[in-house]
Amino acid sequence: MTEPTDTLFIVTGGPGSGKTTLLAALSEAGFATSIEAGRAIIQDQVAIGGHALPWEDRAAFAELMLCWEMRSYREMLGQVGRPVFFDRGVPDVAAYLRLCGLAVPSHIDQAARLLRYNRRVFIAPPWPEIFRQDAERKQSFAEAAATSQALVTTYQDYGYELVSLPLASVAERLEAISAITG
């Protein structure tokens, strides 16, 4: 698993940047997609009264995200041969920890180095016009922008090339992705 897998594409970005909407459109277009770990984990933890939440135990939250992302990666390996799109990837976990001022444990760093995706990673930049807070997204726009910067730095540190998506309609974002993925 140490070689980049050219058909596995990550769509990343700070909260409220439109990436999940874009992933839904990719799914509707017939592509295999994974769902975002963070939101699902928050919903599950709230439902069971758990504490692995970004506002309670960030390290535990990161561990659950790592497990989720590794499982998604393994599941999607069976789709190789056609483009697959992930709503975030393993390096997002390291970026989250860095953003929180926490050390990145060696096993998370190792996972980000071994589980490789296409070298080009799509990033949805901060977009104030569409940013909204909700029950799971408690960050301010400034925090979302800081998250985006942490993602850029982290992905570059792991050897990825960031491709910024346009601040445009979902259809235009799909066109930008198609121009690269074929």
Predicted segments — roles?
Residues 11:
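Hydrophobic anchor at the beta1->P-loop junction of P-loop NTPases
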Residues 22-23:
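Post-Walker A alpha-helix
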Residues 101-168:
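A glycine- and Lys/Arg-enriched "phosphate-lid" helix/loop adjacent to the NTP-binding pocket
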Residues 27-68:
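Conserved substrate/cofactor phosphate-moiety recognition/catalytic segment
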Residues 18:
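Conserved glycine(s) of the Walker
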Residues 62-116, 131:
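Glycine-rich phosphate-binding loop used to anchor ATP phosphates in small-molecule kinases
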Residues 14, 26:
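P-loop (Walker A) phosphate-binding loop of NTP-binding proteins
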